[in-house]
């Protein structure tokens, strides 16, 4: 089975627990296995389901109690430097570094990934075009709006042309226009790479997403095409994604 799944981005048998005062260790993820496909996937789950934890493990910002993450032939434990160079992560609480321009902020992301100064600068210029911020390249990044700063974060994830992008609640707190713009960017960048976007908001899931994965009770409860997930909703549902999600996590039909 694993030989068939080794190509691509694979979480394999991941277990992760957190210690909570007076409660001991509480399991967040339990022997979770998931093969994230090429294209844009919505990682859907209620608050506290472990979505941020799963993405953090995928970016090697957290290490699981057991299991591993692999990208094609690379193992996140044994080949961490090479693995990190091909995976980009935008945490939910993205903030611009004070004092840096937009271009400098994006180039800094490339430098952190091991790119040379010249390559980082060149990559930043190209990435800003992809997120439609080239006209603001020399503005202080900290002066941009929340939606614009999220796009700076996305450019930082794109600067080294990563094969996998892990975006944690990237549209949280944005107005409808900014959300729509961000989803349009996802369509443009997701054609030839793996993009995983976490969300708890079923209303956020549109045709910008090709796939849906539902994280519930420590494991992936659904993994498939968007249309297949919507088809699980009761007949006549006005909000099929929401209905399918609620039915899945409550066990109701």
Task: Annotate the PLM regions.
Residues 67-75, 82-83:
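Conserved ABC transporter NBD signature motif
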Residues 99, 140-144:
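Conserved ABC ATPase signature
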Residues 165-169:
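Catalytic Walker B motif of ABC-type/P-loop ATPase nucleotide-binding domains
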Residues 2-11, 15-31, 80:
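A short, flexible loop at the N-terminus of ABC-type nucleotide-binding domains that lies
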Residues 107, 111, 118-136:
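Conserved ABC ATPase "signature" region
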Residues 59:
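Helix-to-loop junction immediately C-terminal to a conserved catalytic motif
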């Amino acid at each position: 089975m694993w030989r068939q799944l080794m190509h691509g981005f694979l979480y394999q048998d991941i277990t992760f627990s957190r210690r909570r005062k007076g409660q001991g260790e509480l399991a967040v993820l339990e022997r979770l296995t998931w093969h994230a496909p090429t294209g844009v996937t919505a990682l859907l789950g209620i608050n506290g389901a472990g979505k941020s934890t799963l993405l953090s493990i995928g970016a090697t910002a957290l290490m699981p109690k057991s299991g591993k993450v692999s990208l094609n032939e690379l193992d996140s434990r044994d080949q961490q430097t090479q693995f990190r160079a091909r995976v980009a992560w935008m945490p939910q609480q993205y903030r611009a570094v004070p004092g840096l321009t937009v271009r400098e902020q994006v180039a800094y992301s490339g430098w952190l990934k091991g790119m040379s100064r010249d390559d980082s600068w060149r990559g930043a210029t190209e990435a800003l075009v992809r997120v439609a911020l080239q006209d603001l390249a020399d503005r202080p990044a900290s002066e941009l709006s929340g939606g614009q700063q999220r796009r700076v974060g996305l450019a930082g994830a794109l600067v080294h042309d990563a094969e996998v992008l892990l975006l944690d609640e990237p549209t949280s707190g944005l107005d409808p226009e900014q959300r729509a713009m961000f989803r349009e960017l996802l369509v443009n960048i997701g054609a030839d790479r793996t993009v995983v976007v976490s969300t708890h908001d079923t209303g956020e899931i549109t045709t910008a997403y090709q796939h849906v994965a539902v994280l519930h009770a420590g494991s992936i409860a659904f993994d498939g095409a968007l249309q297949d997930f919507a088809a699980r909703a009761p007949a006549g549902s006005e909000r099929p994604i929401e209905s399918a999600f609620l039915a899945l996590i409550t066990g109701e039909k």
